[in-house]
């Protein structure tokens, strides 16, 4: 029996409001995170991912408060990320009601933090978020590099090798965003999604670029992802989660 593939709406939250940009810029307001999360829960989303994109020191308490409000009203798994740097940050988020915590930049600067987090809390609640950009030229073997700081800073790290290293340290899941595709609405980068999904034994969540329901199905069928994440197609009412599930089921994908 094939494992059901998950559909995960993503809330990018800036100072307590859900926003959506293109390639991490041109941000527009999409509403109150708790209201939006509740709507997705009612629609039958499998999980919700909440990424605090301000993640500044002053934004921390707002975030914990929002997570508490969300967890009290939403009864599907909640992954929270953004500015997670210490074991205490993870503990605070789990105590506030997060089911999983996503580590991004901190993993690049201190890979051992991922191992420490997995030992403390178990791999099942540690997600490593990877922002990858294609760096190979025409005619070269495809290669993707990890970028940090919202896609602004190159790290020199190969995305596939890095993902394998994170799995080895105890990450339970990889949240893979294509920086080239983010907000462009012309589909996931299926090359990097497939390369990383095929290299790992843990689930990979495809993110960045969904513009229609076909793209969600492609992430699973062609990208070999375990789950697909989308924001703007759901936030702005173009499609609903039930429509996405019905479409994927028609394509022969097992959904919950």
UniProtKB/Swiss-Prot annotation:
EC number per UniProt: 4.3.2.10
Protein name (database record): Imidazole glycerol phosphate synthase subunit HisF
Taxonomy, superkingdom: Bacteria
Catalysed reactions, as listed in the record: 5-[(5-phospho-1-deoxy-D-ribulos-1-ylimino)methylamino]-1-(5-phospho-beta-D-ribosyl)imidazole-4-carboxamide + L-glutamine = D-erythro-1-(imidazol-4-yl)glycerol 3-phosphate + 5-amino-1-(5-phospho-beta-D-ribosyl)imidazole-4-carboxamide + L-glutamate + H(+)
GO terms, molecular function: imidazoleglycerol-phosphate synthase activity; lyase activity
Active site: 12, 131
Protein's cellular compartments: Cytoplasm
Main location as per UniProt: cytoplasm
GO BP terms, alphabetized: L-histidine biosynthetic process
Pathway: Amino-acid biosynthesis; L-histidine biosynthesis; L-histidine from 5-phospho-alpha-D-ribose 1-diphosphate: step 5/9
Quaternary structure and partners: Heterodimer of HisH and HisF.
Family: Belongs to the HisA/HisF family.
Keyword Cytoplasm: yes
Cross-referenced InterPro entries: Aldolase_TIM, His_biosynth, HisF, IGPS_HisA/HisF, RibuloseP-bd_barrel
Enzyme class of the recorded protein, top EC level: lyase
Segments crossing the lipid bilayer: none
The protein's role, per its UniProt record: IGPS catalyzes the conversion of PRFAR and glutamine to IGP, AICAR and glutamate. The HisF subunit catalyzes the cyclization activity that produces IGP and AICAR from PRFAR using the ammonia provided by the HisH subunit.
Keywords annotated in UniProt: Amino-acid biosynthesis, Cytoplasm, Histidine biosynthesis, Lyase
GO cellular component: cytoplasm
């Amino acid at each position: 029996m094939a494992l059901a593939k998950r559909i995960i709406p993503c809330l990018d939250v800036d100072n307590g409001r859900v926003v959506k940009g293109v390639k991490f810029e041109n941000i527009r307001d999409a509403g109150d995170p708790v209201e939006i999360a509740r709507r997705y829960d009612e629609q039958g989303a499998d999980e919700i991912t909440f990424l605090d994109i301000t993640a500044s020191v002053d934004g921390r308490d707002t975030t914990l408060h929002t997570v508490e409000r969300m967890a009290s009203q939403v009864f599907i798994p909640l992954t929270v990320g953004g500015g997670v740097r210490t074991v205490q940050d993870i503990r605070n988020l789990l105590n506030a009601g997060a089911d999983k915590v996503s580590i991004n930049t901190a993993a690049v600067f201190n890979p051992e933090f991922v191992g420490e987090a997995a030992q403390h809390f178990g791999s099942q609640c540690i997600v490593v978020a990877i922002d990858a950009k294609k760096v190979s030229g025409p005619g070269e073997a495809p290669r993707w590099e990890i970028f940090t700081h919202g896609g602004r800073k190159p790290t020199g790290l190969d995305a596939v090798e890095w993902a394998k290293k994170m799995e080895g340290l105890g990450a339970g899941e990889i949240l893979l965003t294509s920086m080239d595709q983010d907000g462009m609405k012309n589909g996931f980068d299926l090359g990097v999604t497939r390369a990383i999904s095929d290299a790992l034994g843990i689930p990979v969540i495809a993110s960045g670029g969904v513009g229609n329901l076909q793209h969600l199905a492609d992430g699973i069928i062609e990208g070999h992802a375990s789950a697909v994440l989308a924001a703007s197609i759901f936030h702005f009412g173009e499609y609903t989660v039930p429509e996405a599930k019905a479409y994927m089921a028609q394509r022969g994908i097992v959904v919950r």
